[in-house]
């Protein structure tokens, strides 16, 4: 009887491993570049904004919308992948807001991996983890 249980257990394990997604390349937070924040007059420029968004697998416009909404300031995506914000903001404030964005809309709540994709299913935003396969709904912004 124990032989059947062992075979059954192994079959279930094989089935589980077949359904799990392939392990994605790790792109942890330590691999993220530091944001280069410059203040020119009354504007704040984030020079490597597009590169940063590419690393976290989020669209530039989505990250820009979050950041501008949190700062309550107008801004636009400039050429060469930089974000131009109307107003003076310190690099600490911008970095803190992007870290909050990472925790809320990038990091998997199950395994804490940053290998995720944000997708929209009807009116619900869902974080799909590429490392563990978990899907977590998040609130809109």
From Swiss-Prot:
Keyword Cell membrane among UniProt keywords: no
InterPro entries per the UniProt record, alphabetical: IF2/IF5 (IPR045196), TIF2_bsu_arc (IPR004458), Transl_init_fac_IF2/IF5_dom (IPR002735), Transl_init_fac_IF2/IF5_N (IPR016189), Transl_init_fac_IF2/IF5_Zn-bd (IPR016190)
GO molecular function, one term: translation initiation factor activity
SMART domains tied to this protein: eIF2B_5
Top-rank taxon, per record: Archaea
SUPFAM superfamilies: Translation initiation factor 2 beta, aIF2beta, N-terminal domain, Zinc-binding domain of translation initiation factor 2 beta
Keywords, comma-separated and alphabetical: Initiation factor, Protein biosynthesis
Function: eIF-2 functions in the early steps of protein synthesis by forming a ternary complex with GTP and initiator tRNA.
Family affiliation: Belongs to the eIF-2-beta/eIF-5 family.
UniProt-listed HAMAP family: eIF_2_beta (MF_00232)
PANTHER family, A to Z: EUKARYOTIC TRANSLATION INITIATION FACTOR (PTHR23001), EUKARYOTIC TRANSLATION INITIATION FACTOR 2 SUBUNIT 2 (PTHR23001:SF3)
Subunit structure and binding partners: Heterotrimer composed of an alpha, a beta and a gamma chain.
Entry protein name: Translation initiation factor 2 subunit beta
Organism in which the protein naturally occurs: Sulfolobus acidocaldarius (strain ATCC 33909 / DSM 639 / JCM 8929 / NBRC 15157 / NCIMB 11770)
């Amino acid at each position: 009887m124990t032989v059947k249980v062992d075979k059954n257990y192994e079959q279930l394990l094989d089935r589980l491993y077949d359904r799990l997604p392939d392990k994605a390349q790790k792109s942890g937070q330590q691999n993220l570049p530091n944001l280069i924040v410059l203040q020119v007059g009354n504007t704040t420029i984030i020079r490597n904004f597009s590169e940063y968004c590419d690393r976290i697998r989020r669209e530039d416009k989505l990250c820009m919308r979050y950041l501008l909404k949190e700062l309550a300031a107008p801004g636009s995506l400039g050429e060469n992948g930089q974000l131009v914000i109307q107003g003076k903001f310190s690099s600490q404030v911008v970095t803190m807001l992007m870290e909050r964005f990472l925790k809320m809309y990038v990091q998997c709540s199950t395994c804490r991996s940053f290998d995720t994709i944000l997708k929209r299913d009807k009116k619900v935003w869902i974080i799909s983890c590429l490392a563990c396969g978990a899907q977590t709904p998040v609130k809109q912004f």
